[in-house]
Amino acid sequence: MLLPWQQTIIILFLGVNSLVAALRNTYRTVEELPTIPEGWIQGKPPSPETSIRMNLALFQEKAHAFEQMVVDISTPGHSNYGKHLSRRTLKDFLRPRKEVSDSILSWLEEAGVAKKSILNDGDWIHFAISVSQAERMLKTRFHYYHDSGDPSVFMIRTLQYSVPSHLAPDIHMIQPTTKFGKPKKHGNSIAKLETIQLSSNATTNCNVTITPQCLRDIYKMGNSLATPDYRNVIGVSGYLDQYARYNDFYKFIDLYAPDLKGANFSVKYIGKGQNLQNSTKNSVEASLDIDYALGLSNATTVFYTTSGRGPLVPDLEQPDQEHNSNEPYLDQLHYLLSLPSDELPAILSTSYGENEQSVPEKFSNATCSLFAQLAARGVSVIFSSGDTGVGSSCLTNGRKKVSRFNPTFPASCPFVTSVGATFRINPEMAISFSSGGFSDRHIRPRFQDDAVLTYLDKLGNQWEGLYDPRGRGIPDVAAQGSNFAVYDHGRVGMVSGTSASAPAFAAIIANLNSIRLNANKPVLGYLNPFIYGQGRQGFTDIVHGGSRGCAGYNSTNGSAPAVPYASWNATEGWDPVTGVGTPNFEILAKIVRDL
């Protein structure tokens, strides 16, 4: 006969087991969209056998400690400055507890996920699964969703998904599921010209057309060129079927940077990425990025071409890249983070983005964390800020639609350096399309406080309610972004947009890195703590011009509510059009030598 205390223990034990069993049979919603995102139309369900490559992000218990570590590594004067992490050290720091990984892996296998398709990468788990398996496992239904502006573009998505309640605290997100983003090239306009006549007067000519020599003159670079070095590689992101053409690049160098004749770039293929040389598609973005990243720096340059809409397991439903449903950002980031330190680029320049609100919050946070991981490993991640000024549609996409300025992502991630655009010289001015503002997702980092709060004090209550004053300020810096000469398909044209500003700024950073490496110092890595600290005196404040937007138009259906006179003005100090200003290479070179 059991004693009373023994009976109590047995009852408690049975109760705990019953609770665990109950939790295993209940589900908790991880992500849910209130409606189908604007610009998408729900279509038919995919075939049950259609294969999807899933990315599962685990909850990071050490997220705050990790982010502080990244800031410390990147802050001049800190004892850890420049001590970038190896891949193994980073993975070990972020790796979840073994029991967490084991429980999720067991769940995947119980759901029928083939063990050989599972890649356990520490804080992320990747796996392939059929639609029917995913629907059972995530208690959801997938459909094809078509781009209302381009019916040839469609993807497999759902509006919500759930996981077992006992696993929910450890799962941050699973994608592709609720991510309906439309990454766009940040090119405001393209003007095709047969020839561009250049005069010997750099000042006069550079108000009409920007070339590498113009940028050298404007930003006081002189004849500085980076020494090609595997430790100082500029990585250029290629998405959306943009191809970097060798013949166009050679012609550009011959005409606009003849001192670099013989320079070249290499290509790395991610997923099903291609770099077609005979495609008839417009590749101005790829040409622009390569021309100025390399033509202004001479640094070793790599074009990372990622399949247009992410990696694809081909099948009858998605037979080719035109019908690809997955996410290129995640694919590129996981590829780069898998590289050993001696193969990792020192700089990653990307001229693509989308409205921040179009990106699910958990996706935004998880992707931003991956950019932070690149920062921890010493990569300067540079993004164009966008070409919609204060915003385009300026309307929230939730159930309650209200007017709102639209920040862009990934430019709004605090761990990337966001580059706005200027035009003209003497004086250099903010250009109207340069995107900026304040993130609705990411809180302003402390090192931005002095600069941004000074601006907000001057702004007062203007535009109150249309932005979040607590948000990360965008952009960080600016560079010329109007009428860049570029070669595409054998013809010279001019391109405007922050997509021109980003590779130009990346090239300047490569030249600064070269100075540090020649002095046996590490590359600059994550730039923002430096920009808002010791580096700030190396930027020219832009106080003329401003951005515009919210004009009552959007690219999906043409109509949107207008916000009269919506704008951000360039002003003394940091502003949400040009950041802290444009680089002065002479001053920056002196600063980085002494860090």
Swiss-Prot record:
Q: Where is the signal peptide?
A: 1-22
Q: What S-S linkages are listed for this chain?
A: none
Q: What are the entry keywords?
A: Calcium, Glycoprotein, Hydrolase, Metal-binding, Protease, Secreted, Serine protease, Signal, Virulence, Zymogen
Q: Name one GO biological process term.
A: proteolysis
Q: Where does Ca(2+) bind?
A: 541-542, 573, 575
Q: Which GO terms describe its molecular function?
A: metal ion binding; serine-type endopeptidase activity; tripeptidyl-peptidase activity
- List the protein's name: Tripeptidyl-peptidase SED3
What is the species listed in this Swiss-Prot or TrEMBL entry? Arthroderma otae (strain ATCC MYA-4605 / CBS 113480)
